[in-house]
UniProtKB/Swiss-Prot annotation:
SUPFAM superfamilies: S-adenosyl-L-methionine-dependent methyltransferases. This is tRNA (guanine-N(7)-)-methyltransferase. It is an enzyme of class 2 (transferase). It comes from Synechococcus sp. (strain JA-2-3B'a(2-13)). S-adenosyl-L-methionine binds at residues 72, 97, 124, 147. The gene is trmB.
C-alpha cells in the first residue's frame, strides 16, 4: 500500500489517484516504427482534409459486426485503442486520426497483434463522421487529449465543434457515454460545455471525474500522471 501511495497523483479535488508502475500497453510487442518524423499539429481546415473519407469495408475489418461500436476521435498512436480492444473483445473499435502515417502504423500493429475488433482510419472526423455511420451505430465515444490549438484565432481548428456534437447526438444510441479528457482545463471545460449545450447530452456526474473509468491511459495521460500534472475528465451521456 505504501508503494501505491508514493506513486499516486493528487487530484485537484484532493483525492489520491493511484497509477500503475508501467503503462498497460508497455508489454505489447509492437515492432514497426514510422521511419520519419510526423508533424504534431495538422491544420484540419486545409483543403487537402476537406474530402470525406470513404468508409472501410466493415465486414472485412471486423469479425463480429453485431458488437457495440466505440469511436475514438483523434486516436494518435493507437496504443490506447489497441489495449482496450484486447481487454474488451466483445466491442468493436474505430480510431480516427488525421495523420496518415500514424494510422498506417497503428493498423500494422493491429495486424501484428492479430486483433479483429479494431481498425484505424485516416480522416478528418469533422468532415467524415456522417459518411461513416448511420443513426444509432455508435455505443461509446472517446475524445482524449485533442490538440488544444491555444491561440484564439485557431480555436476553430479544435475537434469539438457544435456540428460534431449534433452529429454525435444523431449517431449515438440513447444512454451511450462520451468520455472527454485533456490536461488543459480550458479545453476540457469547453468540450464539455459544447456537448452540454446540446439538449441530447447531460452530465450524470455533475462535474469532472477524478480518475479514468476505462482504466487504460493514453500516452499523454501516462506522461501527465508521471509528472503529477492535473487531468480534467468528463463522462457525459446521450439522453
Amino acid at each position: 500500500m505504501e508503494a501505491e501511495v508514493q506513486q499516486g497523483q493528487q487530484s485537484p479535488e484532493g483525492q489520491l489517484e493511484k497509477r500503475p508502475p508501467s503503462p498497460p500497453w508497455a508489454g505489447i510487442p509492437l515492432q514497426r516504427g514510422l521511419g520519419h518524423r510526423v508533424r504534431q499539429h495538422v491544420n484540419p481546415l486545409q483543403a487537402q482534409y476537406q474530402q470525406p473519407a470513404p468508409p472501410p469495408h466493415w465486414e472485412r475489418v471486423y469479425r463480429r459486426l453485431g458488437q457495440p461500436f466505440h469511436l475514438d476521435i483523434g486516436t494518435g498512436s493507437g496504443r490506447f485503442l489497441l489495449r482496450i480492444a484486447q481487454e474488451q473483445p466483445d466491442w468493436n473499435f474505430l480510431g480516427v486520426e488525421i495523420r496518415q502515417a500514424l494510422v498506417e502504423r497503428a493498423n500494422a500493429w493491429r495486424d501484428e497483434l492479430g486483433l479483429d475488433n479494431v481498425h484505424f482510419l485516416f480522416a478528418n472526423i469533422n468532415v467524415s463522421l456522417r459518411h461513416l455511420f448511420a443513426p444509432g451505430d455508435l455505443s461509446r465515444v472517446t475524445i482524449l487529449f485533442p490538440d488544444p490549438w491555444f491561440k484564439k484565432r485557431h480555436h476553430k481548428r479544435r475537434i469539438v465543434q457544435p456540428q460534431l456534437v449534433a452529429d454525435l447526438a444523431l449517431l449515438l444510441r440513447p444512454g451511450s457515454p462520451v468520455f472527454l479528457q485533456s490536461d488543459i482545463q480550458e479545453v476540457a471545460e469547453e468540450m464539455a460545455a459544447r456537448f452540454l449545450e446540446h439538449p441530447q447530452f447531460w452530465d450524470p456526474h455533475q462535474g469532472p471525474l477524478d480518475s479514468n473509468p476505462l482504466g487504460i491511459p493514453t500516452e499523454r495521460e501516462w506522461q501527465c500522471l508521471q509528472l503529477d500534472l492535473p487531468i480534467y475528465r468528463y463522462w457525459l451521456e446521450r439522453r
